[in-house]
Each structure stands twice: as C-alpha cells, then as structure tokens.
UniProtKB/Swiss-Prot annotation:
Gene giving rise to this polypeptide: PA
Name of the featured protein: Polymerase acidic protein
Residue sites binding Mn(2+) 1 per the record: H41, D108, E119, I120
Binding site for Mn(2+) 2: E80, D108
Species lineage: Viruses, Riboviria, Orthornavirae, Negarnaviricota, Polyploviricotina
The record's account of how the chain is modified after translation: Phosphorylated on serines and threonines by host kinases, including human casein kinase II.
Cofactor binding comment, as recorded: Binds 2 manganese ions per subunit.
Record keywords, A-Z: Cap snatching, Endonuclease, Eukaryotic host gene expression shutoff by virus, Eukaryotic host transcription shutoff by virus, Host cytoplasm, Host gene expression shutoff by virus, Host nucleus, Host-virus interaction, Hydrolase, Inhibition of host RNA polymerase II by virus, Manganese, Metal-binding, Nuclease, Phosphoprotein
Organism from which the protein derives: Influenza A virus (strain A/Chicken/Hong Kong/96.1/2002 H5N1 genotype Y)
Gene3D superfamilies to which the protein is assigned, alphabetical: Influenza RNA-dependent RNA polymerase subunit PA, endonuclease domain
Group of enzyme by EC: hydrolase
GO terms under biological process: cap snatching; DNA-templated transcription; symbiont-mediated suppression of host gene expression; symbiont-mediated suppression of host mRNA transcription via inhibition of RNA polymerase II activity; viral RNA genome replication; viral translational frameshifting
Length: 716
C-alpha cells in the first residue's frame, strides 16, 4: 500500500501527509491505510479549489488556462495540509477579516464567495452515515459539509453542492480511479474496512490545587497517589477470570461464580394483599370530556372562558349524590365542594365581565379537602435540639398490594388510536443540525404514527395541567384557585376542538423548596361506574352528577355521568417534569431510530422509508403470558410511547429501583439467550433488591409481571 500511495499521488501531497501524520505521532510505514486516506482527502481538497477564482467584480469564475496577469483571487483558501499552528492562524485571520463565527475544529477550506468554512469528507462507507458523524462532531450550523464517496455518491449540507457539476465529476472520477487501482492490486478490501468513525481528540486534563488535594484524599485504600491509582486502573484488564479480579481488588472479597443456566432463574415474587389502586394525578382511560368544536367565543383560549363554554354543552346535570364513598374521608365535604364549584361558576356568569381566573371561597369543606391548618407547625431545629426525647415520628410500612387487571387495561388503552390528533407535525422540534432530510423524514413518519395515540392525549393533558397548576401555585399562593383541566386537539376533518375533563382546586402553595407540597382537589367527569372495580377507586369519592345521552348503534341511550373527586398533592419538581412530558415523544422516537439504524446497517442503506411503509412486516412489541406479541410498526411506536408516558405518569421510587435492579437480571438472561455462558454471584441478593421495590405500585407490579413472562419465554 505504501508503494502504491507514493506512485499514485503527487509528491507534494505525499510529503504534506507524512508531515501531518508525524505531527500526530503516526507512522506512514505502519498505518498505510491511514496514509492513503489522508492523501486522498488532501487531493480532494486541492481539486475542490483548483481552477476556481474570483474576478475583480467579485464574481466566481472557472479558469483552466488563461492570462497569467489577470487580477484573479483564489475562490477557496486551503487550510487542510498546513500544520496546526499555521492552520489556526489562517482560520483566525479569516474570522477577523470576514466576521464569520470561529469553528471549534480546523475546517478544510474557506469559500470567499459563499463566506463559509467547508469540511470535506471522503468516505469508504455510506455517505449519510459519515455525514451524520461529521455533523455531530463539528456541531456548527455555519460550517458547510460536503461528503464524497468512492462509489460516486455525495451529500452536502442542505443539498447545496457549492461547485458546478463538472468540477464535482472530476473529483468523483479521480476517487473511482483510486478505488480501481487499489482493487487491481488487492488493496481495496483492507482499505475499505479500515475506516473508523470520526474521532474527537481528547485533551490532556491536568488536576491542580484544591481538586488535586481532594483527589489524593479520596483514593481507595492502599494507593499512595492519583498517578499510582490511574496506572492501576489503566492496567486493569476487564476480561478474564472474575474471581481473580475480585481478590486483586480487596482481600475481604470472595465470590463464588455460579453458572447461570436456563433452570437457574425463578420468577419474581409479586406481593399479596388487596388489589392495587389508581394513583395517577388525573384519570386516564376513564376520563370523559365535554367538548366544543371550532371554538370562536369571546375570550377563547382563556381557560375559565373555555371551561364555562364546555360546561354549557351539557344539559343533563342533576342533584349530585355519593355512589362510592371514600373509606377514610368526610364524604359530604366532597359533595359540598362540587356543589360549591357549580354555584361559583353560576355566579361568574351572572357578572357583567367574566374574570380571567376564579378564586374559590375558603369554605369549611375546601379547607378540609385541601388540608388547611392540618400540617404540624414547623419549628426551627435550633429551638428544639435540646429536647431529650426528640425523634422522628413513626410512619407505617406501606401496605402490600397485589397486581390488578385494570393497570394492563389502562396500558392497552394508552396504545390505542383516538379519532383526534393531539400534536401538530412540528411538536417534536424543528431541525437544528444539518442532518435535515433523514431526521425530518423519520420525525414525520413517527409523528404520523403517534399523533392520534391516546398516550399523546395524556402527554398534552399532563403538560396542560402541570403548567396551569405551577403557574397558579406561584401567582396565587394563598388562594384556592379553580383551574379547569383542558386539552386541545383537531378532529379528523381538521377542525379545532377544546375539551374540558373537570376541575382542580389548588390549596395554599408557598413552595420554597422543590419538594414542598401543594395540595389540590381534583374533580373529573367520567362514565365509568366505580362499583365495577371499587378497589381501583380506593382513593376517590365518586358522585353521580348527571345523565348523558349517548349515540349508539341502537339509537340514543342515557348513561349516568359520574364525578371522581379526590385530594391529591404535587411539588414544584414533579410539576416541572410534568410540564416536560413531551420528552416522552423524543425518547420513544430515539428508540425507534435505533431500530431503523440497526436495519440500515444490515442493509447498508438508509431504511427509514421501507421501515415505515412496509405494512406487511411485524415487529416484536413485548412479552405476554401467551408469548412474544407482534404488531405493525405503528403499534411498536405507540407501545414504546405509552411505556415512556406511563413511566412519567407513574414515576416513583419503586419504579426507579425496579428499573435499575431488574435491568441487571435482564442483561444476564439476555446473555444466556445469546449463548454467552454468563456467571453470577449473589443472585439471591439481586432478587432481594428487585423484590423490595414490589410493594403496591400498579405500574411497577405490571412491569414485574411482564418481566416474569419474559423470563419464562426467553429461557424456554
């Protein structure tokens, strides 16, 4: 290969390349593929600039041979091929004279006509892949990227190829010739396979001063200095016999490695006890909306105005009564609270001008429901540190609950399609990086699959409620503000629709710390009769408040309308995360992207289109007692989204612990499935760590039961 490079390339290029490699401590005689790659890249940069000039009128022209005295300036400044110091000097002087933003990495060329730096890439792989790597590495809008491949493909930022067809054809022809010359000498395969991704050079990082002293103090025992410890870590071979490694780490550790076989794992033990209950901050599948289409009333967009308008669409109100009391609460207070909301809404309507916000009267029932004056008085620690029997008051262990079928139904519902669209196409954010085309295409396909999904409705509902509650908590700290629970969507025909799910009344909210709690009472409409699954509604008092006429196949039927009322609480940090629930869209899009990337790398081309448009193919969605469930790509998108949304709606310490610990067991089981002969020590301890998170949380219990299905099928 070295001989080929010296024959094939201009001696000046070879010399510059040797100099550059030596600057980075690389030997052209040993790293021959790299030698060839750098020469090729340098030659492409030179060819890119050849014959391109700017005349006295600042027009760009091509001159192959002409009057040597013409006042022509080179269109491109060549930066590649200079030593680092010189290259940075050139870049800095260009930035100073033109005002262009200074790049983070040394680019290859500067274009005086377009006033931009250019990064040239020459790849033996797929142009898209290399383009993405370049874009990710330089992370700059301003630097233009132009990638050529040895197969004649090219890709450039915003499909703006800078040069005319003919100049680019010269470059492509030259690359093709190099490839053929290599192939005829049997060098091409090794050259093609040797391409590494873009590497970013790590800076040497010195620690000095206080940090250095802290580092020396915090070393593990038996190490005298940071250098000493670093040398040990660098020399630590991660593969090899684990027992030996453990004894090398510490004399006290001894671990017997047990082989992990198909018969080793047992199912997770799910807790016994009464069935678990609903604990989300708002109703999910059981929610009922009062809606207005094409809202155009006065004050449209002001929540209170929208809510009153929605309330007026319903005519079946009746005297409310309790149909499912709350076991521990003073139920008549919940009833009075609803009556108070109706009365105060009526009062608003009788006023001349409807106010933008409504603060409820501080009645006995609301004070009770919002826990006013219930919190023990806070005493400064200084005043009581001398009390002899000072202790934290006892709190009961949480009561164990068993898995109930309702949570699986909730999840199934969240994966379904509704007949409305809950996000616009651009909800997942505009393109920022220059990976425009593929990224937009994936985003648009994905959005089309999930925009009508019920989980997306939950996202928008969660964002709305948390935003409104956080705003009110800061703006009206002492007031019992009435907050309508609203969402907006578009119907199949594209008409706008505003929906009211019910109301929240916020308690006092002097939130100093992130974890300080604000209490609220939620009142939500529903057609679900709570007596069908009373265990699900343990935390609610449910009223019957009206009758609703529903259109069915057999004509109109009247169904009782219920109001689910409960006391609840949240904190600044929880509301902050609730406001950011749109991240779930991004998380599930990234999971889908990694599936597409895997497909694409097998097929060696971007598979986005085929992935979403091949309707006949099915994909694994999850495990159930019946086996591996499969479904269309849309179903996969919606299932991943629903999982992400439920992780947000049912976030809890139990979920954090379960996810972290069960993942370890999952990886071991997958290693066994891939015939990697995994070994474990203290498997009992791992089971204990997982099972201590299985207490009473419905979403965690459901995940644990899915995990058991996975274990059963994975290890058959």
């Amino acid at each position: 290969m070295e001989d080929f490079v010296r024959q094939c390339f201009n001696p000046m290029i070879v010399e510059l390349t040797e100099k550059a490699m030596k600057e980075y401590g690389e030997d052209p005689k040993i790293e021959t593929n790299k030698f060839a790659a750098i020469c090729t890249h340098l030659e492409v940069c030179f060819m890119y600039s050849d014959f391109h000039f700017i005349d006295e009128r600042s027009e760009s022209i091509i001159v192959e041979s002409g009057d040597p005295n013409a006042l022509l300036k080179h269109r491109f400044e060549i930066i590649e091929g200079r030593d680092r110091t010189m290259a940075w000097t050139v870049v800095n002087s260009i930035c100073n004279t033109t005002g262009v933003e200074k790049p983070k990495f040394i680019p290859d060329l500067y274009d005086y006509k377009e006033n931009r730096f250019i990064e040239i890439g020459v790849t033996r792989r797929e142009v898209h892949t290399y383009y993405l790597e370049k874009a990710n590495k330089i992370k700059s809008e301003k630097t233009h990227i132009h990638i050529f491949s040895f197969t004649g493909e090219e890709m450039a930022t915003k499909a703006d190829y800078t040069l005319d067809e003919e100049s680019r054809a010269r470059i492509k022809t030259r690359l093709f010739t190099i490839r053929q010359e290599m192939a005829s000498r049997g060098l091409w395969d090794s050259f093609r396979q040797s391409e590494r991704g873009e590497e970013t050079i790590e800076e040497k990082f010195e620690i000095t001063g206080t940090m250095r002293r802290l580092a020396d103090q915090s070393l593990p025992p038996n190490f005298s200095s940071l250098e000493n410890f670093r040398a040990y870590v660098d020399g630590f071979e991660p593969n090899g016999c684990i027992e030996g490694k453990l004894s090398q780490m510490s004399k006290e550790v001894n671990a017997r490695i047990e082989p992990f076989l198909k018969t080793t794992p047992r199912p997770l033990r799910l807790p016994d006890g009464p069935p678990c209950s609903q604990r989300s901050k708002f109703l999910l599948m059981d929610a009922l909306k009062l809606s207005i289409e094409d809202p155009s009333h006065e004050g449209e967009g002001i929540p209170l105005y929208d809510a009153i308008k929605c309330m007026k669409t319903f005519f079946g109100w009746k005297e409310p009564n309790i149909v499912k009391p709350h076991k521990k609460g003073i139920n008549p207070n919940y009833l009075l609270a609803w009556k108070q909301v109706l009365a105060e809404l009526q009062d608003i309507e009788n006023e001349e001008k409807i106010p933008k916000t409504k603060n409820m009267k501080k009645t006995g029932q609301l004070k009770w429901a919002l826990g006013e004056n219930m919190a023990p008085e806070k005493v400064d620690f200084e005043d009581c540190k001398d009390v002899s029997d000072l202790r934290q008051y006892d709190s009961d262990e949480p009561e164990s609950r068993s898995l109930a079928s309702w949570i699986q139904s909730e999840f199934n519902k969240a994966c379904e399609l509704t007949d409305s669209s809950w996000i616009e196409l651009d909800e997942i954010g505009e393109d920022v990086a220059p990976i425009e085309h593929i990224a937009s295409m994936r985003r648009n396909y994905f959005t089309a699959e999930v925009s009508h999904c019920r989980a997306t409705e939950y996202i928008m509902k969660g964002v709305y409620i948390n935003t409104a509650l956080l705003n009110a908590s800061c703006a009206a700290m002492d007031d019992f503000q009435l907050i309508p629970m609203i969402s907006k969507c578009r119907t199949k025909e594209g008409r706008r629709k505003t929906n009211l799910y019910g109301f929240i009344i916020k308690g006092r909210s002097h939130l100093r710390n992130d974890t300080d709690v604000v209490n609220f009472v939620s009142m939500e409409f529903s057609l679900t009769d709570p007596r069908l699954e009373p265990h699900k509604w343990e935390k609610y008092c449910v009223l019957e408040i009206g009758d609703m006429l529903l259109r069915t196949a057999v004509g109109q039927v009247s169904r009782p309308m219920f109001l689910y009322v409960r006391t609840n609480g949240t904190s600044k940090i929880k509301m902050k995360w609730g406001m950011e629930m749109r991240r779930c869209l991004l998380q599930s899009l990234q999971q889908i992207e990694s599936m597409i990337e895997a497909e694409s790398s097998v097929k060696e081309k971007d598979m986005t289109k085929e992935f979403f448009e091949n309707k006949s193919e099915t994909w694994p969605i999850g495990e159930s007692p019946k086996g591996v469930e499969e479904g269309s790509i849309g179903k996969v998108c919606r299932t991943l989204l629903a999982k992400s949304v439920f992780n947000s709606l049912y976030a809890s310490p139990q979920l954090e612990g379960f996810s972290a610990e069960s993942r370890k067991l999952l990886l071991i089981a997958q290693a066994l499935r891939d015939n990697l002969e995994p070994g474990t020590f203290d498997l009992g301890g791992l089971y204990e760590a997982i099972e201590e998170c299985l207490i009473n949380d419905p979403w965690v219990l459901l995940n644990a039961s899915w995990f058991n299905s996975f274990l059963a099928h994975a290890l058959k």
